[in-house]
Amino acid sequence: MVNYVLRKMLGTKNERELKRLRPLVARVSELEPRMKALSDADFPRLTAEWKQQVRNGRPLDDLMPEAFALVREAGVRALGMRHFDVQLIGGAVLHSGRIAEMKTGEGKTLVATLPSVLNALSGRGVHVVTVNDYLARRDSEWMGRLYRFCGLTTGVIVHGLTDRERQDAYHSDITYGQNNEFGFDYLRDNMKFRLQDYVQGELNFAIVDEVDSILIDEARTPLIISGPSDESSDLYYRVNQVIPSMIRDQDFTVDEKSRTIVMSDSGVEKMEKKLGVQNLYDPNAIETLHHVEQALRAHHLYRNEVDYVVKNGEVLIVDEFTGRLMPGRRWSDGLHQAVEAKEGVKIEAENQTLATISFQNYFRMYSKLAGMTGTADTEAEEFAKTYNLDVVVVPTNKKNVRKDSEDVVYKTEREKFGALCDEIETRHKKGQPVLVGTVSVAKSEVVSSLLKRRGVPHDVLNAKHHQREAEIVAQAGRKGSVTISTNMAGRGTDIILGGNAEMMAKHEVGPEPDLPMEGEAEESFLARKQEWARRLEETRERLRGQTATEHDEVVALGGLHIVGTERHESRRIDNQLRGRAGRQGDPGSSIFYLSLEDELMRIFGSERIQGLMSRMGMKEGEQIEHPWLTKAIEGAQKKVEGHNFDIRKNLLEYDDVMNQQRRSVYRLRRMVLGFGAGVPVVEYDEEPKTRKKTRREQVFTWGDQREHVLDLIEDLVFDMVGASCPNRLSDWNLDGLSSMVKEQFGVEMKFAPPSGKAADARREIEEQVYAVVEKAYRQKEEELGIGPDGEPVLRRYEQWLYLQAIDQQWKDHLLSMDHLRQGIGLRGYGQKDPKQEYKKEGYEMFVQMTWRVKSAVIGNLLRLQLVRQETAEEIEQKRLAAQRRAMQRITETHAAAAGDGEEKPRPKQETVVRTQPKVGRNDPCPCGSGKKYKKCHGATEAAV
């Protein structure tokens, strides 16, 4: 009651926020006459002046009204588009690092230009993240006209670019790109052998378009870079041959809700007999068990034409959220190979993880993150908890008049498809455009074949026909058009009633000439380009009149009609489909046709809904519309959303452990690459509670590298002496210490029996060993001499050996962590919290890994023997050749949705875990603070 009264008096939080932003809109409008008076040349001049002012310390917030007013006028001059007042509000929300919920058709693409120009003034880059390559290209070219008018540069990151092209794109003021490409560039950069080969630069400010799709829907699937392992494909074929003999509900059970399969005792016995294995659960047969489980999942959970398609002898994943094919992406953990065996195509080698990151942890690295979408408010809590992002609902420019009908439900799919085809045919005959939304490729093909039989002309937009995507969507609002789409989320092209004259003109005229023909003179090529531009403008003008007339006719018919063939597992996706109609105050309507055989109803809501329908006395062939039913269906969707949220939360909790380790390793790697590079290494320190980031940069010299290597030697000596010389003198093992020193450092040492206090004697031995090893290090330095750059040659070998050690040990550590993750679920049976166990053991394994890195670097360094003195250039070429070899063998994948199956132990190699791990005192602390261990957790533990 109190909250209700306060809301009435003060307004909701969203209303208060909108009220707070209105003075900004008024100020921008006041500045409009001043901006109109500027010449075109004044725009880049003002931008350059503001850049200098920001460098001199002027806050961006201080410049916001002027910058927004400049961008608004630039939009008019460069694009013929003026930002509405509500778009200015959206721009301010994005600049403040929040999510702007703006309905479909409200011009989100144009809104992004406001904070992009303002934040580009910092000179530290702005990334605009889209859901596909087409939108990245389109928006960078389209909005690029506005940016260039303001004197700013634009780049685009899409699949297939070279590193040089990527560097150029990232060096632009504003960079557009697809979400996966940004994440993979980060991972690839941290596998490079020179800082100058990094492409991405700083993660300063990101604006994520369709933010709910990228940061929530796709957050279940981490990005993985992997390389081929040595495993044979024979076992996949053998297991696949015997899977058909397994009988569902007798030999195994399938839980489609949790996407898991469990074998019964009879199923296990059958597989053991068929495969000639004595005990599938024997540690030596655990790999075979894993193959069996993945083969069962491939046969009974992953379906052709729904989860993947087979094209040109290759299994291509279908993105479940957008319906697009994902060439080059593979499911991990042997699942993709199991599907290949099932479909009878060539099995590609299974890959080992080399680098991985979740979308949550990638995007949380940005200093400032913002997003925009038509549907975010329903997920506001998750955005706040996971990304520290608030959602502001921006009002529409014109009132939404779309009519949304209650769902119509039938008992069977056959009845449902018949009824919805009747609806489509009736609307088509009237001339009203219809957009049909389906949840899979297979369902879109079913609707298409039914409409063909009725003679209803239509276009199909799914993973098989995505090449014509923009063209099809652009014409979906034309009179009499029928368009079938697997998923309208993120399609990104507005459906304009009467047709899109711009897209129609481009289709009619054809693509712009981009390269001269063989032997063609430059004058001829330029003339061809000019002729193309003339024809495009001529065609555009002709079509504008045609589409304007058609627009009025379609409005009179009721606008675009949306027909949903099934409820998606997320209410947001349904709302996005509905949101395609009724843009900018246009009329429109929507209705969903459902059946009890639909996947969502069958798995999550069938019994309750069937009971409701039985009580209403529904018979075969009858339809029902009722608010109770709509609520029950929404309840089923909420169940799925809750389940998916748990999966994302689970993934994040596990990945947070890896994230701290990954950031620590990558930070160390960048420091090593920075030694002697002469360029600053930029790092961000994050305050854990607020996630506020502090930027710092540091230049590392060759002298810093020498100091660092001596620190590593000190750490190793400290560890060895500590292990051999505990607190009781009677437990000392000096012979063992001599052997360890010989093995690690290659030097002979004998130690006299200790006397006095153990601590003093131990310190004396530490100093003895360190002095001997430091002398051996200096001798190695003198032996290799001074290079042409005036620095000891040893420096470059140190750096090379250090990078090799980090990369090899990190790769092995990722494999060990994979195995730990797969088996950790069984700890629950022993009354232990699997996550806590994973965190504890993962930390211990990480500590061991850092010790192995130090041991490998120093051991190899002191044993280094050169047959021939190599130049710095030759050493550099070796590193680059190794980098090229590594990059040629990698594969980028989206993992199968985390949580798709039960976690099972799958040890390929045994990991020895010390019970009392020691971190080197000068190592980066594994907690990810960026401090040395001895000044962070090391100091705490020493005090204890």
Swiss-Prot record:
**How does the record classify its membrane topology?**
Peripheral membrane protein
How and how many cofactors are bound, per the record note? May bind 1 zinc ion per subunit.
Q: What class of enzyme is it?
A: translocase
**Residues reported in the UniProt entry to bind Zn(2+):** C925, C927, C936, H937
Basic and acidic residues compositional bias, start-end = 901-911
- Asked if the keyword ATP-binding belongs to this entry, the reply reads yes
**Keywords noted in UniProt:** ATP-binding, Cell inner membrane, Cell membrane, Cytoplasm, Membrane, Metal-binding, Nucleotide-binding, Protein transport, Translocase, Translocation, Transport, Zinc
Name of the protein in its database record: Protein translocase subunit SecA
Which species is this UniProt entry from? Answer: Anaeromyxobacter sp. (strain Fw109-5)
Lineage in the entry? Bacteria, Pseudomonadati, Myxococcota, Myxococcia, Myxococcales
Gene label: secA
